[in-house]
């Protein structure tokens, strides 16, 4: 692993430090200020002639990002999480320690510098070193020195390198953290209670997806990593909670692309005595709050598309297929005509698909990618909405919506089905679909039906994909850019490096 000549050179330097009685992996030394706090506190020091007050000693820490050796002095750029700060180290101050520094210090090492503030001839605020310590000797050179890390695969597989050399990546994940905390705060302000439900389920449910399967040795039973928390959250509504939410991971054993990762984060929330129309209004308030919190304009650019949050619209499923997808009603309302139309358009569909699933295929191919501004699509076919409440006026549609922004689904919500007999029949239909080969059809969950039989109040529930939300609000083009450690195809790692020296 460490046979590379450049690594061997660095290992030799680490051992050389030990021979001098210095631990190349020290612990216990503390900084007094972050780099940003140092720059702010001593911003008034702008002139080389400022008194060099050694009583104003501060200790700063960070990774060496740039090293310029010049005979009896050197300039070092030290980066912590907050900022880059320049350190000036002179033989006049450190004597023999300066010789050790010149011999051992390299870009990538993590150091502590103790000294006083001063300005260089160019006016740059710096710390004039009185003490210098290597806290952690890095034995693998950083890639491409100060030019960044451009290999996309390497960036995802070795995210730590990506974070070291690409400051903008850190910014994305800091913004992700702000988005998640803002979403949590919004729902708390709206009166929702945050809860936690199981991650391992005896029966996978709450979504149409293929689960990951594991085995519980103590119980001697199979368990499934959850594909959605929905059925457990609705059990809580049965139990008397009236507004709950959960932000956590879901796992779906399916394909990966720029907007899908098998492990992803969602918020799901359930609101008793409300309808899906109330959720639409709540969603509008949520986005208003997020844009304000993130200091974003109502118009944002995503993937070269202008998304205008002031142009939010609501449209029914069939109207969207007709007016946006360009499919006439006489085709949409006849199953055989719709199947023929899809085949004529080159859409690959299975001949045994139900009418509702044919409509879904048409929507996916002809409508979804055109929904740029926030669009709430309502009145979904009941056949593709097994957990949603049946519409009172039209039993063939569900009181359901999905929110699309920039051509992607961002949220899914509906008035919940709380009729246990209807739910039991729909589960039976899903089981029949699974027996026909539909791996994503839902399982029978009699325990959940039994919970519903104890009475669930009229309730509305919704899920929002946090990763896609972060993509939208940060401009990231791939879900891998907003997940710190995304799923990757296994490769043999030979630990080759190209020296940045």
Swiss-Prot record:
User: GO CC terms for this protein?
Assistant: cytosol
InterPro entries per the UniProt record, alphabetical: Aa-tRNA-synt_II, aa-tRNA-synth_II, aa-tRNA-synth_II/BPL/LPL, Lys-tRNA-ligase_II, Lys-tRNA-ligase_II_N, Lys-tRNA-synth_II_C, NA-bd_OB-fold, NA-bd_OB_tRNA
* Family matches, as CDD domains: LysRS_core, LysRS_N
Regions that span the bilayer: none
The UniProt similarity line reads: Belongs to the class-II aminoacyl-tRNA synthetase family.
Give the enzyme's main class according to its UniProt record, as a single word: ligase
Q: Where in the cell is it found?
A: Cytoplasm
Q: Name one GO molecular function term.
A: lysine-tRNA ligase activity
Q: Which PANTHER family match?
A: LYSINE--TRNA LIGASE, CHLOROPLASTIC_MITOCHONDRIAL (PTHR42918:SF15), LYSYL-TRNA SYNTHETASE (PTHR42918)
* Cofactors, names only: Mg(2+)
Residues bound to Mg(2+) 2 are 409
Please describe the quaternary structure of this protein: Homodimer.
Q: What is its main location?
A: cytoplasm
One Gene Ontology term from the biological process aspect of the record: lysyl-tRNA aminoacylation
Q: Where does Mg(2+) 1 bind?
A: 402, 409
What name has this protein been given in UniProt?
Lysine--tRNA ligase
Q: Name one Pfam family in it.
A: tRNA-synt_2
- As recorded in UniProt, its EC number(s) are 6.1.1.6
